[in-house]
Amino acid sequence: MNQDLRSAIGNRHWIALCLGLVALGLCLLGWFLDPRQFFIAYLFGELVWLGVALGSMGFLMMHYLTGGMWGWPTRRMLEAASKTLPLLGLTFIPIFFGLHYLYPWAMPVQVAADQVLQHKHPYLSPFWFVVKACIFFAIWSVIAVLLNRWSRQQDSTHDVAPLIRIRKWSGPGLVLYPLTVTFTYVDWIMSLEPDWYSTMFPILICIGQMLSGLTFVILLLFWLGPRSSLSAVTGKENFHHLGSLVFAFTMMWAYLAFGQLLIIWSGDLPHEISWYLHRVAGSWHAVVAFLVLFHFFGPFLILLSRQVKRSRRALAIIAGVVFAAHIVDVWWMIEPSFYQHGIHISWQNFTALLGIGGVWLFFFTRNLESKSLVPLNDPRFALAITA
């Protein structure tokens, strides 16, 4: 047990677990009261925390390949977040029982009346949805478990063989990550409106996930740093590098989001443009304005300042804003598929987000406690802190 971290966190992880279980209990009540809204909200909550875990795994593999200074104080957090992927595979299971509430292709009546759905039925069907989800969760879980296992082996030996294995497999892992996300998010989000398609959408999802994983660890690093041994290896330069990454990924997210909009809007094809029309109709345009301001323009303009990137508090505030904006972005991708005339907010959105999040934070913290907060016996780490 990491006593350093345990003294900093105290019993907060147990509080998170209790709150999460209470929220999940309320979700169960929502299942009986309004099953359709329950599955909409549950899908939203699941994909928010899955995005944090997958984005963290992506950054973890990126750090193993590059060895950047930004990764040393965050590596354990990235490892702990990625190790929750098997848990998120289990929490995804309830969605299998509500496909007919979420997806038109799971409703035989709609399939019979829609030629597009009939054409896509060999790929979009309940059976293959479950099979593909199980396969891809297995792939993610295997990658995460191996990365964590080899990292633990490196901690216990001066032999660099585990580090070589990690670097050897991180390259293919970074290829598998966007490929698997492409297939899964076509099923999980794009097929909520199965007539719609966009080749840019999956990579936009990947960038959003990595941004959510990055901002999450920045928030944790800001809160935990002064309370733990991380303070000795976390300085202004580290925060500067992390701030530069937030800046870069914010720009990439905006570039892809605008590029997708521009291509679809200029094409003006009914099957493509309808997705955006549903998301700007009525009061939904206020959510678009929120995302433009807080997911791009605000962070972009503020992070132009070198002083902001080097300030722990300022960067943590920006990270918190971007993380919150990403949650709204996931909600905006899902909710208008069902409520196309204006904003619809249900209490089940909050209980699902908090319920899955509370359980996730508990296991994340337990994973984080199981190892030293700084890497051991990694020769690159020694070089980084003396540079």
Regions found by a protein language model. Give the residues of each.
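Central hydrophobic cores of alpha-helical transmembrane segments
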Residues: 313-324
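Transmembrane-helix bundle segments that line or gate the permeation/cavity pathway
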Residues: 46-156, 173
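Membrane-interface capping segments at transmembrane-helix boundaries
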Residues: 145-155, 363-377
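Hydrophobic cores of alpha-helical transmembrane segments in multi-pass inner/ER membrane proteins
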Residues: 53-61, 89-95, 133-145, 207-222, ...
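N-terminal regions that are enriched for targeting/export leaders
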Residues: 1-53, 121, 365, 385-387
